[in-house]
Amino acid sequence: MKIIKKYKLWILKNIDSKYLEILNSKYIYLTKIPNNKHAVISDLFPLRIENNWNTFFELLNVPRLINPVQKINNEVEICFFDYNGKLLNVYEKVMLDQIKNTLNLKEIAKKLDITKDGTFAVFHKNDSQKLSSSGSFISDRGYVGYQNINHGPIKGYVHGNFDAVSKKDKLSLLGVSSFFKKHYIIQYEFSPEYKYELFWVNTSNTNKTITLVNLSSSNDKFSINIKPGGVKSYLFKPKDISKLKLISNLNMARPVIFRYMNGSFDVFHG
C-alpha cells in the first residue's frame, strides 16, 4: 500500500491534471502539490489600495497554533505582485508571542513604493519537520479585510480561495487547467439594485481567457485575459436578476465578488 501511495503522489506532483483528465475525467484536481517537501503555500489575494481602498490581512502565528507548547518566532514573508503577476517587493515580519496581528497592507505597500492594485501572498518560513515528513505543508488562505471610506467605515472580510503559489527556493504557481472548456455557474443571483465587481486571479502558469455569459435575458458575453499570476476585475451592473456562467480552461474560475450598495459594500466568493 505504501508503494501505491508513493506512486500516486509522484503522479500528482509530476503529471499535469489535464493529461490525466484525457484518460479519465475523474482524475482532475484544483491545485498542484509542491515538488519540494519543505515548501510553504499561500493564496494569491487581491490587493486593493487605489481609489481610497485599503486592504488588511489577519496574520496568524501558524507555527504556534500547530505547536502551542513551544514558543516559536514566526518568520513571515509577504510578497507583493502587480496586476500582471510580476513580483514587486517582499516585506518580512517576525511574530514573537502574538497569536494574531492585523496588517495594514496599504501602509506596508507605501513603504515599499507600491501604489497600484495587484496581489499579495503570505509565506510562513518556519519549517515543520512533522508536517514535511507526513507530506503536509503550511498554507495560508486566511482572512483579508477590505475598506473604503466612500462605502462606509466597516471592513468587509473574505477568506482565501486556493493553494495558489508555493515558495522554497523559488516561487511556483500551483493552479491547474484543462484541455477542455469548463463551465462554472456562479452560486449567486445578481440583483439590478446593486453594482458588482468580480476579481479573478490566474493561479496557473499560462495565459488564461475567461468568458462571462449572462444566463438571464440577453445571453450577453464578455471575455477577459489574465496573465500567469495576474489579476483582473470586471464591473457588472445587471438590468434584471441575473446568473453568470464562466467558461475557461481553469478547473475552477471562482471569483471574489464585491457588491456595492448605497453607503456600504460586501465581499464574498462566487
Tell where the protein language model's regions lie, with residue ranges.
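Gly/Pro-rich, tryptophan- and cysteine-flecked surface segments typical
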Residues: M1-G270
